[in-house]
């Protein structure tokens, strides 16, 4: 009995090209969805961490009479006396948040992290000394202060913003602007009433509080009112 063996035919070049085109098309369709899902996850983490920062901020304000302020550094160091020295200058939001750690109110560095273009890896939670606490790239939130680098207190307008992310960064920070691409045109903010919300970022990179009012708008009928100049204290980028 004669057995016939059929040779298995391989793919032709045309068939391989068709398969490649189909795979590329599917990848092109799914890539935007994957990016949106990633951005949404990063935004959700930012909201969660902002809430934790809010609890620490308001406990600090109750204890010291204002949110982190340069004048409070020595007070914290005297009252707590730990190895972690509270900064007496606030030139970055890292400095402001280090006061929360030095005061023993914040017990983790990771609440200050959120994924942005300038903060790319979570802190290691080693902050026993100042040089170890909240290093470059550990902090995703900017911190808002008033005229003359003076901290706000909870007695101000409840609609004022205390911390915010993601800030516009391309080698340096762009004043008063937010990164539209990071969280799909959303800015995550902690307000003075200890609420966390996501604001729309307009085409100019400005966060919109409501109606036509932007976050940094000043004067009558704004949350800042007359005579207050809100200033964003930026994080130390990676």
Regions found by a protein language model. Give the residues of each.
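Short catalytic/ligand-binding loop motif for oxyanion handling, primarily in non-cytosolic enzymes
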Residues: 61-62, 67-70, 75-78, 119-126, ...
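Structural recognition of the beta-strand scaffold that forms the well-ordered cores
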Residues: 61, 68-69, 111-115, 161-163, ...
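Amphipathic alpha-helical segments typified by the pilin-like N-terminal helix
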Residues: 2-48
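Surface-exposed intrinsically disordered loops and tails
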Residues: 74-91, 124-149, 207-237
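C-terminal accessory segments of extracellular proteins
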Residues: 169-238
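Conserved hydrophobic/amphipathic alpha-helical signal-anchor segments
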Residues: 28, 32-93
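Acidic, glycine-rich loop-and-strand cores that form catalytic or ligand-binding grooves
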Residues: 102-171
């Amino acid at each position: 009995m004669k057995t016939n063996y059929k040779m298995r035919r391989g793919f032709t070049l045309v068939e391989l090209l068709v398969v490649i085109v189909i795979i590329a098309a599917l990848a092109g369709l799914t890539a935007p969805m994957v990016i949106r899902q990633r951005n949404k996850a990063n935004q959700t983490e930012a909201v969660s961490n902002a809430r934790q920062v809010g609890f620490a901020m308001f406990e600090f304000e109750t204890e010291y009479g204002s949110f982190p302020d340069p004048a409070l550094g020595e007070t914290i160091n005297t009252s707590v006396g730990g190895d972690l020295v509270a900064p007496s200058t606030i030139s970055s939001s890292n400095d402001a948040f280090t006061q929360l750690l030095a005061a023993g109110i914040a017990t983790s560095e990771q609440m200050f992290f959120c994924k942005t273009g300038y903060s790319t890896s979570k802190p290691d939670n080693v902050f026993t000394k100042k040089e170890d606490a909240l290093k470059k790239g550990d902090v995703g939130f900017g911190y808002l202060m008033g005229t003359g680098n003076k901290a706000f207190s909870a007695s101000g307008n409840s609609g004022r913003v205390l911390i915010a992310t993601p800030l516009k960064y391309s080698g340096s920070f762009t004043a008063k602007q937010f990164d539209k691409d990071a969280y799909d045109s959303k800015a995550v903010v902690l307000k003075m009433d200890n609420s966390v919300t996501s604001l729309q970022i307009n085409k100019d990179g400005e966060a919109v509080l409501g109606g036509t009012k932007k976050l940094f708008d000043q004067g009558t009928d704004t949350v800042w009112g007359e005579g207050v100049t809100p200033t964003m204290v930026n994080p130390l980028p990676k």
